[in-house]
Amino acid sequence: ACEAEDTPSCLSEDESATLAKWRQGPQSQDGTQLYPGGIPEGSEPFWWLWLTGNAQGAGRLVPAFNTDFGRYMAFPTDPGPAWTPAEFDFETDPARLATMAEVYNGDSPDLSAFRAAGGKMIGWHGWADAIVTPYKTVDWYEKAAALAGSEEALKENVALFMVPGLDHCGILPGPDGISATALDPMTPLETWLAEGTVPTSIMAQ
């Protein structure tokens, strides 16, 4: 934080505190983690699009999305057009999200039927995803490994690749130029299915 006056190149104490909360992810008042992880380090090049906006007034898509999602899709009973994200109650509202989560989410870590059928899956997530935290995917993978008996058992059917510098869905190219169009998970998946060669990498063009 700035020890002198606040400037565009230095964070105030309040700004630093906000950033720390972004990093830690949502918690209840007693410190219970409500969702795995927060906004990852390395996602800063994409904040203008999703979180902060830029000097030209572009970006800042997450607040707009969260507002309408909360009004009309998040809860069993829609709170309506007057609701704002500032009204979200971290003590009571997470439980209220569970009903619609059953409709929207496809994140069960129980892959027993998939594995028994001989299925193969390649998953990937960008480490620089500022809006769907990659820590959730890591958490899902760890739970899937536990249910499979071990990570080695899970690897017979599932390969997960965490991509440094990759934005949410690879929409914007990062500083290293990687975007979703640069990744090719299909070729190693097809090779895995046809030849039984377990993928150890995904090539980025």
Task: Please state what every model-predicted region is.
Residues 1-205:
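C-terminal His-loop and adjacent cap/lid subdomain of alpha/beta-hydrolase
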